[in-house]
Amino acid sequence: MTFTSDSASTRFSQAFGIQTGDAVASTITVFQALSIDDQLAVLWYAYTEMGRSITPAATGAARLQLAEGLLNQIKQMSHAEQLQVMRDLAAKNNTQVSRSYGILSNNTKLAFWYELSELMVKGFVVPVPTDYKISRDGSQVLEALKGLDFGQQITVLRKVVADMGVDPLAD
């Protein structure tokens, strides 16, 4: 599993020189400029490092039972297939799993990624390699995310995971 990206560096320095009120939009913009693997790494680190505070907000408002079948389906896959599913979701590739994910509510998508990170920690889903070191750009996005207040963090995470997958009902 290879995670690399330095492509968003210049956008980062420009994006985070903006006022605090624009911090949410800037963080989202730079996150979306990361490579797919770096996006997945940032989500994993965000959920594992900040998961204790994210969990109540995500699962409290979500109907996670709607995503349980999808999570169980992913658990049954090989690690290579699991990684491909996550990449397909982030890249908005039109697959059966991406379409199933696409019909979930934004809060359920937020909870889905939290549960996926928990499954990674428990070894049911392909983990981030133990020797993995997040890219400079990914690290900057993660630090920017940590610098936001709780409500802003949830807004950023909800927006980035809401944009993943494919909405089968969209025109």
UniProtKB/Swiss-Prot annotation:
Alphabetical list of Pfam families matching this protein: Carot_N
InterPro entries: Orange_carotenoid-bd_N, Orange_carotenoid-bd_N_sf
Subcellular location, record wording: Cellular thylakoid membrane
PROSITE patterns, A to Z: OCP_N (PS51773)
Gene Ontology molecular-function annotations: chloride ion binding
Alphabetical keyword list: Antenna complex, Chromophore, Membrane, Phycobilisome, Thylakoid
Gene Ontology CC: one annotated term: plasma membrane-derived thylakoid membrane
GO biological process terms, semicolon-separated: light absorption
Protein family per UniProt: Belongs to the orange carotenoid-binding protein family.
Protein name: Orange carotenoid-binding domain-containing protein
Native source species: Nostoc sp. (strain PCC 7120 / SAG 25.82 / UTEX 2576)
Source lineage: Bacteria, Bacillati, Cyanobacteriota, Cyanophyceae, Nostocales
